A protein has these predicted regions:
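Long amphipathic alpha-helical scaffold regions
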Residues: 1-193, 197-200
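Extended alpha-helical solenoid scaffold regions that build the rod-like backbones
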Residues: 174-317
């Protein structure tokens, strides 16, 4: 009797487990099919010439939430089926739907970044960007997310710096500039651009990265580095070349170098804060190097000028 009871209990347990498994399978497959319908609704047609309409448009908040929830449900269903080694025809459907969804989110991410304006409803944009980034990263598409951010924001940063008058500085270019009568005008342009670049352009980019990738510190630092490092290093090329070329020139560039030194020195705390992470610390190191070189050059020029004035005074005496 005891044996019979044990056998019945075991069979009942097995039957219950099997029923539960079938129920879970069915639920996951339903989730995949429901997600597919919603995702296909927003599939990007590469051959279409119609105007792009964002899911995250102000009138589409319900659609955006529904889309992101569908992607999350799809990801959970895929994880369940793969972890339980389920050979389901819905796996291929899920994978295809996920690729379509990620392509859509890449486009949305790119478009919102292009339209991003720090002074106009930027908190809404940042919230949407963060939702997209977190969804893409959690679904295993971090590389694609980082790539879109880099391409879009680096272009925006470079354009902003160019608009301020920052050039791609070369030795030959600076040499001509120093010997030209309007050197002071070029320096004024750089000084103004430098202030805005540090206080506004790079500061706002740091703000954007910190909030969009708040849950992923490594990605946050990488994206800020990708978008700003090249432009920031080029920014400090100007004073660096001024010092190098001025070694052979007369000392009337003293006040130019003093202005450059004071400007960088004033922004030193902000520079140290913005470019503190190891991945972009080369910018901070270049700023320190510029200050050191400018300081040495100013002292040398001051001594030279003092000697010239003393010599001139002795001659007239």
């Amino acid at each position: 009797m005891a044996i019979t009871t044990i056998t019945i209990t075991t069979m009942s347990s097995t039957s219950s487990s099997s029923s539960s498994s079938c129920s879970s399978d069915s639920m996951m497959e339903d989730n995949i099919q429901c997600a597919e319908k919603i995702i296909l609704k927003w599939k990007i047609d590469s051959h279409s010439h119609s105007t792009f309409v964002s899911i995250f448009h102000k009138n589409n908040t319900i659609e955006a939430t529904l889309f992101l929830n569908s992607v999350s449900n799809l990801q959970r269903a895929m994880h369940f089926l793969s972890s339980n080694d389920k050979k389901s025809t819905n796996i291929s459907i899920a994978q295809r739907s996920m690729q379509i969804a990620m392509k859509r989110l890449e486009k949305e991410f790119h478009q919102i970044l292009l339209d991003y304006n720090h002074n106009r409803q930027h908190f809404i944009s940042i919230s949407n960007l963060r939702l997209i980034a977190e969804t893409m990263i959690s679904c295993g598409y971090a590389k694609e997310c980082i790539s879109v951010y880099k391409i879009t924001r680096k272009s925006t940063i470079d354009e902003a710096l160019s608009h301020l008058g920052i050039l791609q500085y070369k030795h030959s270019h600076i040499k001509k500039m120093i010997t030209a009568p309007d050197l002071q005008n070029h320096v004024k342009i750089w000084l103004n651009a430098f202030q805005i670049a540090i206080k506004t352009v790079f500061h706002e980019e740091k703000f954007l990265c910190d909030h969009v990738f708040s849950s992923y510190p490594t990605i946050r630092n990488l994206c800020f580095t990708n978008s700003t490092k090249e432009g920031a290093l080029n920014l400090f090329t100007f004073p660096d070349l001024i010092v190098a070329i001025c070694k052979r020139l007369k000392s009337d560039t003293l006040f130019v170098k003093v202005d450059l030194y004071n400007s960088i020195s004033d922004q030193r705390p902000e520079i140290d804060s913005l470019f503190s992470h190891e991945s972009i610390s080369s910018v901070k190191l270049q700023a320190e190097s510029c200050l050191q070189k400018l300081g040495d050059s100013v002292r040398t020029s001051a001594v030279l000028r003092r000697s010239e004035l003393l010599a001139s005074h002795l001659i007239h005496c």
